[in-house]
Amino acid sequence: MEPGLWLLFGLTVTSAAGFVPCSQSGDAGRRGVSQAPTAARSEGDCEETVAGPGEETVAGPGEGTVAPTALQGPSPGSPGQEQAAEGAPEHHRSRRCTCFTYKDKECVYYCHLDIIWINTPEQTVPYGLSNYRGSFRGKRSAGPLPGNLQLSHRPHLRCACVGRYDKACLHFCTQTLDVSSNSRTAEKTDKEEEGKVEVKDQQSKQALDLHHPKLMPGSGLALAPSTCPRCLFQEGAP
């Protein structure tokens, strides 16, 4: 009975630890008849062992073995990974168009809907910013471009739209720049008109100075002293 008690003690300890060793086929011959129920119970326990998420139970003839597969990792279609994928969707950076220069802040905020901020709002690095000009990039040559069109005759765009049929984006990349250029030309014309008016005023002042009595030769008239600035007197008068 002593070996049977030791066997029961070992089984209880190992079951408390979470692992039940399976009895070997050679042990059955060395054990007595009184140990047969215990061995049968241990074999039943091995067969009824529930495999965890990373283990597989393989039952052989007369014995049960546990093949651990924890090193292989969870399967791709496990429910845990599906829940993680549903809970944390991938972050997709949307981009409507590509600006030709990062100095155009309005274009940067319009095209790049997701902006990476660095240190301060003044220093921004838009996602996907590049100098891509599409088909409007010309070669370094003085000759005509394909299609007999010079680069200067092509419309100067401030950005390149991702979607070809995005009318709002195309309108922003073309019409907005035209409005700004028109405003600049209007400012230039206003400044030119102001300059012309100033030149005319200076010319009129010079003409008045030439007709002044002090500057006219042989008039014999001069301005009175500072005590009487409005008085005129004739030279040589008593």
Swiss-Prot record:
**Can you cite a GO biological process for this protein?**
cell population proliferation
Q: Where is this site: Cleavage?
A: W117, I118
Q: Which superkingdom?
A: Eukaryota
Primary place of residence?
secreted
Enumerate the residue ranges of region (Disordered).
Answer: 24-89, 183-219
Example of a GO MF term: endothelin B receptor binding
Q: Does the keyword Membrane apply?
A: no
Keywords, A to Z, come to: Cleavage on pair of basic residues, Deafness, Disease variant, Disulfide bond, Hirschsprung disease, Secreted, Signal, Vasoactive, Vasoconstrictor, Waardenburg syndrome
Q: Ranges of Basic and acidic residues compositional bias?
A: 185-212
SMART domains registered for this protein in UniProt: END
Function recorded in the entry: Endothelins are endothelium-derived vasoconstrictor peptides.
Name of this chain's protein:
Endothelin-3
Instruction: Give the organism the record lists.
Output: Homo sapiens (Human)
Could you tell me the gene encoding this protein? Answer: EDN3
